[in-house]
Amino acid sequence: MVTLAYFILAASASPQVQQLTYGIAKTGQFLFPVMWVMLIQRHRPKVWPWSAKGLLFGIIFGLFVAGIMLLAYRFVLRSAPFFLSAANEIREKIDGIDIGSPTIFAAVGVFYSLIHSLLEEYYWRWFVFGQLSERTSLIKAIVFSSLGFMAHHVLVIGTYFGFLSPITWLFSFGVAIGGGVWAWLYHRTGSLLGPWTSHLLVDAAIFAIGYQIAFQIPTN
């Protein structure tokens, strides 16, 4: 619902309205877990341990995924007709939310890689996976939380490649795999440091590709 609100329903609005919608939606999303635990479950939210256990695995997995993405973009996607067509729409979106300068785009990329990735780990692994793991088996908790993590990415990817496109579902399935690995790692270590570090490396690669799409691929 959050992605639907700011990415699709507000897509034709002014940059200011889109940014405001994004801010309100994201604030609600990231406040919800704490409010749920405190007001519904009547628990004091536990601060997860920042153990380095699992950090090396997280770094290796993050670098592996980031490397695959960058290589796929460099040697396959960059010149693919379907990707060039999507690149035009991606540039329009970037301009539409008023982050079309290299400096602003880079700053947004740093924010997403460092801060937003941590907030997503807190939401999807600590809260969604954590709540599910208390109510069902480990495998089901990993699968369902990862599919939820994938779902909002489907809305974003499908906007550019088409919701019936195999590319949309291939990329989205990759997101689900990543979410599953991070949920498993969080379960094994009890720490978000490994999943967060892994996630931020992947997000950094996404924004590196996005930067090239926005400012280096010739427009059609």
Q: How would you describe each model-predicted region?
A:
Residues 103-220:
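Transmembrane helix-loop-helix hairpins at the membrane interface
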Residues 14-19, 45-116, 134, 166, ...:
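Juxtamembrane helix-loop-helix connectors linking adjacent transmembrane helices
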Residues 34-38, 70, 74, 154-158, ...:
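Membrane-embedded alpha-helical segments of multi-pass transporters/permeases
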Residues 1-6, 61-66, 144-148:
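Alpha-helical transmembrane segments
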Residues 37, 62, 66, 70-71, ...:
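Hydrophobic alpha-helical segments of integral membrane proteins
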Residues 1-57, 204-220:
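N-terminal, membrane-interfacial amphipathic/helix-forming hydrophobic leader that caps
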Residues 6-16, 76, 154-160:
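Juxtamembrane "helix-exit" motif on the non-cytosolic side of transmembrane helices
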